[in-house]
Structure formats: structure tokens, C-alpha cells
């Protein structure tokens, strides 16, 4: 059964400067080989700015860059960006394969405390991405607080969160990532940023990978620009779900 080698890039972001951020991640991705998935934070071209979509890089430019990096690393490159589309501005999680196939998920739960819901359009589609034998559920930041949206109907193996999650609520980030792994009997990975942004928000990172039993198998030091690696085991995941099949007793409802 295939394992999955995942890398999370916990990095600072340059406020509202797409080219500078792409140059920064060029340097971070240089020399990375032997990975299956490489994850960048939420809004990795701009930081969490409400006006980012209006002045953002075009989706084609971002996708072309991500495709080149996916080919360079022979890995799925994942991260969200603020984009202007024909139907409005979105916080779009892009997952790009080396062959150029593009998957995307538009953030469902918009962070009203920062007026995100006034500047961006909420997505309404839950997406599962199949990659190298794994089923991946992409989610963005505030989505983490809403467990129904990440409810595992035995349809995914890894929930992948990207975030700009502020330091004052870091305990929530850590606890909820663990809860999502335990309740869904799935791997969970959360890639958060570090540093400060143009709104004066501070971020400590705490990026991590958690196994289906809630054990942290890789974690980043707080406030550090760093990279963490983990290898996920499909055999261990299936064995646990077979030996402790709590998912079979889940309440029967769905909202999508």
C-alpha cells in the first residue's frame, strides 16, 4: 500500500506582494525531492488581506508557477491564493500536479471577524482530490471550526488545512486539528504561516501532522520559518479503521 510523503512549509509572507512571495518560495522549494505533497500556507501570495484579490496575480500566472514547481519537485503543490474570478473574489485552495492537472476548492467558511465574508464569495462544493493512491480533502483555515464540513463519510484519508491562524488562538488551532483527526479517523495536516502581516496580526505557526489516533507525528517549532516532513501510512490507517470502526456508527446525515 502506498505511503504518502508530505512536506509543510511554515513561512512568513510578504504583505500584498505576489512576485516577492513567489521568489521566496522558489528558494524554499529548491532542492526538495522525494516528496509526494508539498504544502504552502493560506493566501501564500499576499497574506490574509481583504483587498488582495483585486490586485492579485492572475490565476494562470499562479498555476503556471505551481505547475513548474510541481514538475521540479515531482510532487503535488498545494496552497491557497486570493483570486478575482468572473463570479467574484475567492480564497481558492489550488492543488497542482506535475502533469499540469489543477484541482481547486473555494473556502467555504469565511472569517467574518475580519470581514472576509464581505470581500470574498464562499465556496459551496466539497472537493476530494485523489493523488498517488490517497484521497485528500482540502480545507482552509476557519473551515477547521466547523466539523460537519469535514465529516468523513469514508471518502477521504487525509484532511489538509492551510491557514493564516493568529497566535492568540493557537491553542484552538492545535486542539481542533487533533479533534478532526480523532473524530474522522483520518490523517490531518495543518500548514500555518509565521511572522506578522499588514494588519498587525501575529502568527506563530504550530504547523503539524497528526495521525488518526490523534498523535502528533511531526510539528514545527513556534515562530520559526521552517519545513517539516512526515510519511503517512495507508496500511496503518486501514488497520486502525478496521480494528476500531467507529465510523460505522456515525449519525446518518449530510449537508452536501
Swiss-Prot record:
Lineage top rank: taxon: Bacteria
Keywords of this entry: Hydrolase
Active site: 42 (proton acceptor), 107 (proton donor), 141 (nucleophile)
Domain CN hydrolase: 4-234
UniProt catalytic activity: a monoamide of a dicarboxylate + H2O = a dicarboxylate + NH4(+)
GO MF annotation, one: omega-amidase activity
One matching Pfam family: CN_hydrolase
Enzyme Commission number(s): 3.5.1.3
SUPFAM superfamilies noted in UniProt: Carbon-nitrogen hydrolase (SSF56317)
Transmembrane segments: none
Similarity comment text for this entry: Belongs to the carbon-nitrogen hydrolase superfamily. NIT1/NIT2 family.
Function field: Hydrolyzes alpha-ketoglutaramate (a-KGM) to alpha-ketoglutarate (alpha-KG) and ammonia, has weak activity on L-glutamine, almost no activity on deaminated glutathione (dGSH) and none on glutathione. May function as a metabolite repair enzyme.
PANTHER family, alphabetized: OMEGA-AMIDASE YAFV
UniProt protein name: Omega-amidase YafV
Taxonomic path: Bacteria, Pseudomonadati, Pseudomonadota, Gammaproteobacteria, Enterobacterales
Gene encoding the protein: yafV
